[in-house]
């Protein structure tokens, strides 16, 4: 029994150590409140990491896997997430001015109450994403897949949504002043005034 108890204790200690072990990539320690401005994390596997409160301004995370990550209240100013996987990631209350999310996978990600003025979201996958109360002023959403996305009370002032797919999206209370809405696909889309737009549904 003592041998079994000792083995269980050792296993628990090793498990705890592994859980607390921190990954360091190119000098950047992956942890809460990490200070890694300009870091090169391209192609890194950072799945389910906790980067809440981190400073990743100007960092290169192109092609990185950040699925399921927690990156709340972080500074992602001008960071590069092109072609990155952020599906299911939590990025609420995060500052992302000028961030590059082109062709990134943000399916079911939470970007609520985040600040993304001038962000590049060209051809990004925003299916089922939550962008409620987000500041998307001047963002480029050209060709983005926003099916089922929620933009409730979001600011899309001067945003470019050319060829964006808003099938099943919710835009209740969203501000679309001076937004570019050329060839946008509307189907079962809830508009800012709560009306349903089915103009793009296949007949």
Where are these regions (language model features)?
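Sec-dependent signal peptide recognition
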Residues: 2-10
